[in-house]
Amino acid sequence: MSIGLIKLIYKRKGSKNNLSNFRPITMLNTDLKILAKILANKMKNVLPKIIVTNQAYGVRGRDIADIKSGIRDIISYLNETQKDGYVVNLDFEKAFDRVEHVFLFAILERFGFGKNVNEWIKILYNNVMTRVVCNGFLTEPFKITRSIRQGCPLSAQLYTLVAEPLCLMIKKDKSIQGIKIEEGKEEKKIFQYADDTTLILKDLESMKEVMRKVERYGKSTGARINEEKTVYMKFGRVPNLVGIFNFEEVKETKILGVTLGKDEKGARERMFEKLVGEMERRLIFWRGRFLSLKGKILVVNALMLSKMWYILTVSAIPRWVEVRIKRCVLDFVWEKKPPRVAYNTLIGQTDKGGMGLSDVELKKKSMRIKVVKKYIDDQEKGEWKDTMKYFLDKCGEVKLGDNVLWMKMKTWMFEKIPDFYKEVLKACFFFSLKG
């Protein structure tokens, strides 16, 4: 039961001759996966209570969008206030594969998991053997003394527990200064989703102290920073890190699949230009197929527009993108001929006689209303809520806070808030008219 098979999956970047550009996925025995899934379901119930940081990976009720939104808003805040600071995107080398089992078992005990749970997890991870599938052949079995198996149903919960100590060390150290949005509120210092770690630091001394913490954490867990892939953006008058750390300074970077940069509008434009180009090329491929109208709509919804929804949850969308996508979709559906069905019928619900085609503008507005719903829900603990309140207070410089969500506002009142929150307010007004 303890023997797994490792299959190497190419990451689709870098040379295939470099082994580090492959991701090891472990295929496990079905009995083991059933047992691991039972334990994972039990752990899901307690993780929200013991993971006190903003870590969202494998924690029930938390969303990756909260992490992306928090980082996006901090960048907007630093640009708007012109305050000093660093936004550092740490790259942990083979994060899951380097976790020491001794540390993993110690963490489980430290978090108070019972003896039975700990023993079952030790059965799953102690004295386990693995073989590698390579070119259709199997290597000889070898013993695994470290790593959290990617492919194990428990991997998300276990790695979240392993990552928590680093986040706690950074958050609790008062010598490490983050960015404070409002007096009386906690400083924003670190955002985590699995091993994707983004630091928000005020000065160089804080950066040095964080790296000391990371080094100490690595000695215990086996974690190691890949300095060549770690990048940072600096804001205000903070010094460059060249000669201090082997990190690359960038104007923009991709964080959790979304491009964020100092030039927020420019980074967004380039991200959508690339995305829309990929969508158009994908539809060219499908044009040669003999598809029915329903088949074409399925292709558009499932293979084209679905790629945009992930980004749209946290990024404002330029108007030209909406226009270009709509034109591209209609050209594909009607084969560049005059439409035979009204657009409102195309996007209408199928149970009401429509065709169910997704509409980018309506989807955007519904996503923005979801943001409002999470914002006014006291059970939601996303750190972006502090920055959203800050930007809502900027509307008209009258500090009306949440009240602006229910008001009809003049265009000039939007000028000092990020484009994303402009879309939020416009969506509120749109649905208030519908109501």
Language model: regions and residue ranges:
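Basic, alpha-helical interaction scaffolds
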Residues: 194, 245-317, 334-338, 366-383
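Active-site nucleotide-donor binding segment shared across nucleotidyl transfer reactions
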Residues: 173-192
